[in-house]
Design a protein with these regions (language model features):
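Glycine-/small-residue-enriched transmembrane alpha-helix faces in small-molecule transporters
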Residues: 1-48, 96, 145, 155-190, ...
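Hydrophobic alpha-helical transmembrane segments of multi-pass integral membrane proteins
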Residues: 16-21, 45-64, 139-142, 165-168, ...
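Specific transmembrane alpha-helical segments of multi-pass solute transporters/efflux pumps
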Residues: 28, 65-107, 113, 149, ...
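Hydrophobic/aromatic residues within transmembrane alpha-helices
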Residues: 39, 46, 50, 100, ...
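Specific alpha-helical transmembrane segments that line the substrate/conduction pathway
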Residues: 48-56, 98-129, 169, 260-278
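Hydrophobic transmembrane alpha-helices of multi-pass small-molecule transport proteins
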Residues: 58, 132-152, 169-173, 210, ...
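Helix-helix packing/entry segments at the starts of transmembrane helices
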Residues: 109-115, 183-184, 189-211, 243-279
Length: 315
């Protein structure tokens, strides 16, 4: 979600529409757990076919926004190493999350992936030169305590592997906004036209990331069992709605709301995800998973509140 948000402009024309967009994005993202569990394919096949459905969404949006300038925008985006590293991070996030969802519960997969802000806090200074304060350290500590709570109960071997993959997915997801911010930073001598084109780098990253995801899983998709009609429907929902539509709604919503409001509303995703899975498959998260996840969410949200509401220094 951070990927598209980084390209959003800060002018909020309609707050009510902003609330609707963010809620719609959270609802769309939350379909991942149930959808992935409902697709009887290997993780690689699921990633590849889901990416194929997401590709036209991002391609159309990029074309619609830049039209005749599309070749120049693509050349600029693909010429930057940050674009490729960010796209690889995005692809790994997709693959590791799908694998984690098949090896552990949906609650563990989504809530452990939600530790992504930890890595943003830890790497902001070395990558972007941003100072890390006491509130940042406390938020990181709270998140790691929450992760420890996840592992409090005895888990099966497959559960441990799934949790590890979910943690790696969170790390790669946390790297994504940092790389995108680096990719969008223009050279001091860059022209106004180049600066305008850099705004579309996040969409280029998403487009490239889904191309890579489709290619990585293509051998498994071509040699594995052919999906039935219901499976194709779920793949379409995951690609078009859970990836494509969700990112577009979030991008529109963050333009209209304060950061803390967007953060609060988007946090419905990890709560709704295991609820959908419970309704669809009867899979219930453990008490330790719920408690640890709530501590992670509380740490992330309190950090967002502190950052947004603290007094601004006088100019």
């Amino acid at each position: 979600m951070s990927a598209v948000a980084s390209s959003a402009s800060p002018a909020p024309p309609s707050r009510s529409a902003g609330f609707a967009f963010i809620l719609g994005a959270a609802l769309s993202w939350s379909l991942a757990g149930l959808g992935i569990k409902s697709v009887p394919l290997s993780a690689l096949s699921s990633v590849s076919l889901r990416a194929l459905f997401a590709l036209p969404v991002f391609a159309f949006v990029l074309w619609f926004r830049v039209r005749s300038d599309l070749p120049a925008v693509l050349r600029l985006g693909l010429s930057r190493w940050q674009t490729w590293v960010a796209a690889l991070s995005y692809t790994f996030t997709m693959l590791s999350f799908v694998l984690a969802s098949k090896l552990t519960t949906s609650a563990n997969a989504i809530l452990l992936q939600y530790t992504a802000p930890i890595y943003v806090i830890l790497l902001s200074r070395p990558l972007l030169g941003e100072r890390v304060g006491r509130a940042d350290v406390l938020a990181v500590l709270g998140c790691f305590l929450g992760i420890g709570w996840f592992f409090l109960e005895q888990l099966s071997t497959s559960g441990r592997y799934g949790n590890l993959l979910a943690l790696l997915s969170g790390a790669s997801l946390g790297l994504l906004p940092l790389l995108l911010r680096r990719a969008e930073q223009p050279h001091p001598a860059a022209s106004a036209q180049t600066r305008e084109r850099l705004v579309f780098v996040p969409t280029v990253v998403l487009l490239l990331g889904n191309v890579l995801a489709a290619l990585v899983g293509a051998p498994a998709a071509l040699t594995g069992p052919w999906p039935g009609p219901v499976t194709w429907l779920w793949l379409a929902v995951l690609g078009v709605v859970q990836i494509g539509l969700a990112y577009l709604l979030y991008a529109a919503g963050v333009r209209r709301l304060r950061a803390v409001e967007s953060l609060m509303l988007a946090s419905l995703e990890p709560i709704l995800n295991p609820l959908w899975a419970a309704l669809g498959t009867g899979e219930l998260p453990s008490r330790a998973a719920l408690c640890g996840g709530l501590l992670i969410l509380a740490s992330v949200l309190s950090h967002g509140l502190h950052t947004t509401l603290r007094p601004k220094p006088p100019r």
